[in-house]
């Protein structure tokens, strides 16, 4: 018979199809006298009960399909391997589905320390590491580990094995159980779902000879399964995840593209089931007609699964849970060449691949350098770079082309726009942001420990030019901003604890804010003139809204410029001018070069002070008052408006070094003194009385008259005394 010819190379007895004791399409019970079967080791009763439902359902569907066929078909059977335990095997028939399976009866053994290990469920389920490394094991055949793949066996799996996703793996991307986990890590690990329309008649597998027989004809019983179903199942320690078959493609006869992850695996598991060619193919070399196999012809394009009998049918074959089948193909090639077990290819352990997760295909992200870290929720755009030890906090984002230097950090919610960069040790606090279009130019940096406080921002168009830096501890307060076009020029710096209040403007090249200095809201530093090179605001100094300082101007600690006060370009508070502590300039007031305002002095609006003039402490200049310098003579012109007079007369006080006076001046004073008819006092008394009367209509400083000589006479009083004499 064709079936006998088919199974002759495997030395397996096949019963006639007319035998009523065996169900068509299933393997008959093997003889107990067969030495090959006697060497087969039985699985535990608990493991058999776990897989009974799966095996019975599979055989039930298979029997229902075979009953509809007109002719008898061959059964799939394979030679049982030798095991060092020397156990006796008996045949049992499941009453529910008539399926034959092997139930093994262990032979009594001598009591020894290794007897418990030999009967363990995990006996020979893992490779012996010393044997794999050196080819020698001191335990010999008593070793509980497999010496090569020929002794390797697998445990029967639970019916729900690899049917649900692993929550730990898909939540954190790591599972401590690794490949031993009973849940799904990668998409190809899911169990195959086989329907009646996809179940073809089991037949010989052309690749089974390749997997079980070497070139020297030696059997490879290590690739076996303890499943009671009796069907071919190949496994090893790394081959633990069953293949997920495309049920729609199998049932509808569709074409599976070659890019599908299971396409390469399915190519290795397709077998010819035509009864007219099975005997002829079994006698030939498995690799002789490999080019004629239709599965090879469709490997590069697609795999077709027609529903007609006699073509291709899938076989329960376990594959590695990696996305590629290159390690499996390499392993098959070594089996064909008859390589030693110790030199065989070790299958890699399964790793979580972004493209093979069951929750969807993940996008390919940019690479991180060693030591770089990204917290959950952080985002790194394509072409962005994280150098070693740099870190992105949750919610932080780096746009295209942005870079972070070694040790730089971004807090939660911080963001860097394209081209922006953070230097070593620099940090952006929570909520800090560089607005769209803001940039840190090439070479610009935030020094170690510098920070942008919460809510601080750089507006559109702002730039930090090359060489600009924010010193250690410098900060921009909440809401502070650099307006469009504002810049911190090269070598400009903010000292520790310096701050820009909301609405404060920029610093010119080489300008500096010393520790504790502040720019209050609304203060303006004019472009090109405000806080120019070497200009400084000492600790505690304040610029009010609208106030300005020209180059080399200075404000002493505690000094203030009132709102609206102006320092005129080139003259107001020029180089060398100083405003003492608690001194103030009212709106509209101005200071000329080399003017010094002492403590507690106040200048009212409209008052101007000429160069070289100094005001005393607590001195007051009324609105409209002005000082000027004429040659070497220092004079004071005061214009005062009172409620009693619409206009005040002009008084001129001249020092005694004047040699003569004009006649017109004498006439003027005669008219003024004609009303003083009761003035008949002495010269000293006349002079004192004049000072008392003139002080009520003038705002001259009394200190200017303290040094007057008592013997000094005014011309008008000299004239009166001469006429009386």
Swiss-Prot record:
A zinc finger (C3H1-type) spans 122-150, 160-188. The chain crosses the membrane at residues 380-400, 420-440, 441-461, 468-488. Rodent-specific retrogene derived apparently from its related family member ZFP36L2 mRNA. The gene is Zfp36l3. One of its GO terms (molecular function) is DNA binding. Pfam families: zf-CCCH. Residues 280-294 have a biased composition (Basic and acidic residues). GO terms for cellular component: cytoplasm; membrane. Disruption phenotype: Mice are viable and fertile, without apparent morphological or histological abnormalities in the placenta, but display a decrease in the numbers of surviving offspring. Display an abnormal accumulation of placental 3'UTR ARE-containing mRNAs. Exhibit also a decrease in ARE-containing mRNA decay in differentiated trophoblast stem cells. Disulfide bonds: none annotated. It is a multi-pass membrane protein. It comes from Mus musculus (Mouse). Contains long series of C-terminal alanine-rich repeats that serve to maintain the protein in the cytoplasm. Its main location: cytoplasm. The keyword Transmembrane applies. Expressed in placenta and extraembryonic tissues (at protein level). Not detected in embryos and fetus. Residues 42-72, 100-119 have a biased composition (Polar residues). This is mRNA decay activator protein ZFP36L3. It is found in: Cytoplasm; Membrane. GO terms for biological process: nuclear-transcribed mRNA catabolic process, deadenylation-dependent decay; nuclear-transcribed mRNA poly(A) tail shortening.
